[in-house]
Amino acid sequence: MKPVELPGWVTEAIAPPRPLDTGGELLWEAGATLAEGPLWEEKTGSLLLVDIPAGKVHRLQPDAPSVSSLEVGAPVSSVIPRAAGGLVVTMIDTLVSVDDDGKSRTDLARFEGAGDRMNDAKCDPKGRLYAGSMSTSGGFTGSLYRVDANLEVVALVSEVGISNGLAWSSDRLSMYYIDTPLGTVDRFSYDPGTGDISDRTVVVRIDPGFGAPDGMCVDTEDHLWVAIWGGGVVLRYDPAGVLVGELEVPAPRVTSCCFGGDDYDELYVTTAREGMSDGELDRFPLSGSVFRFSAGVVGTPPVAFVG
């Protein structure tokens, strides 16, 4: 497919990390409408993330400190390194490659029947991309897809409301999944050879009054870290679904989290301002920021897309 020209990366210095009274650090006061999809990029020592409605991919380097931003077009819902070089992003109904210098993007694959737009995405241990879509009107018109190394798109789950968090167990036999309106974290049996999933069961139920599950990551102890939209927290659950820990975030709309840093013992958390009233923003002025916490455990490194 014909490449589309892009403006390239623009880099700016940002304020140094600032300690929070509740623990952790304010890493970047981004003012993002909907910061999402954080993922550690080991080769650059930076955090990748997107601001969905702004159509921007950000590369945040905590040690500089600086942020490089690239306008790829809205909405852009996830960003993942590509094993062959550059990045891949999910847009409305398309998987798109972005070259290293941010000067062009090229469509790779299309997600048929994707509902209103694509949302969260992550690679499995084999480098296959799992990407979900969503409805913006409260329906269940989304799906969860897998993109194989040959760029074939396989639909795995239908009638999805808002496809969100994905994670895999250390034995590579389970995949965890969040469809936000259901208020649950579900577990599938996962075949590492084929990438197929089956036997869906509920592991965690979130009280709707407390918030809704959004993004998710997993540590090397097979504990799940779940971002709670509307709850201002990241919750940690053991493999049986028992709540064993909580991190308070000074922004109610917590969107996602990932492990990063040299030893993958830091938890990076993204948040949003979308849909908040002026009064809410006055109470929570750091909404839309990126935060960092000492996790006390080690997380699993991300995997690049092999397609």
Label each region the model flagged.
Residues 103-158:
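Hydrophobic alpha-helical segments and helix pairs
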